């Protein structure tokens, strides 16, 4: 049975600097690198106190956010959820979501299914400053 192995920190390009936010935001997409067919995977490191500038929703994709290090908060539609290490949060299609890091930063894995194919932007809608205090 064929398999694919990649190191999320060393083998994948960091797209974080392409976002118009914190310069030390880290965003590594593993879906294509791992040849995933049924799901998607990203690793994100959010600097302390930083709120991701965009909220987003998916038409068809369900996502699970797994906190591997740090803490933070997540806004899902109108509800705020506190996050700590090894929390897993499932977000269904159609729900708006955004997140921010706590004082020690936030590292998350995001698993999505189904795989969104060659143009994932067809499934997603995003809004800048969606989560405003």
Would you name each region that the model predicts?
Residues 43-47, 57-75:
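Short, conserved beta-strand element in jelly-roll/cupin
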Residues 1-39, 48, 121-133:
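A short, N-terminal "cap"/entry segment at the start of jelly-roll beta-barrel domains
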Residues 78-94:
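Short acidic-glycine-tyrosine-enriched beta hairpin
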Residues 36-39, 47-52, 71-73, 80, ...:
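Short, charged/polar surface micro-motifs in flexible loops or helix N-caps
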Residues 60, 79, 95, 104-105:
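A generic "binding-loop/recognition-motif" signal
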Residues 23-29, 42-58, 93:
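Conserved short histidine dyad/triad with adjacent acidic residue
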Residues 54, 74-75, 91, 97-103:
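Short beta-strand His + acidic residue motifs that chelate non-heme Fe in jelly-roll/DSBH
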Residues 3, 98-133:
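Double-stranded beta-helix
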């Amino acid at each position: 049975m064929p398999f694919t192995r990649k190191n999320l920190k060393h083998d994948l390009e960091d797209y974080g600097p392409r976002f118009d936010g914190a310069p030390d935001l880290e965003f590594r997409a593993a879906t294509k690198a791992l040849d995933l067919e049924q799901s998607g995977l990203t690793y994100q490191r959010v600097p302390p106190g930083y709120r991701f500038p965009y909220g987003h929703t998916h038409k068809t994709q369900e996502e699970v956010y797994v906190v591997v290090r740090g803490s933070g908060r997540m806004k899902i539609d109108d509800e705020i959820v506190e996050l700590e290490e090894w929390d897993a949060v499932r977000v269904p299609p159609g729900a708006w979501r955004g997140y921010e890091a706590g004082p020690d930063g936030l590292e998350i894995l995001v698993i999505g299914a189904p795989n969104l194919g060659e143009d994932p932007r067809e499934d997603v809608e995003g809004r800048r400053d969606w989560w405003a205090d």
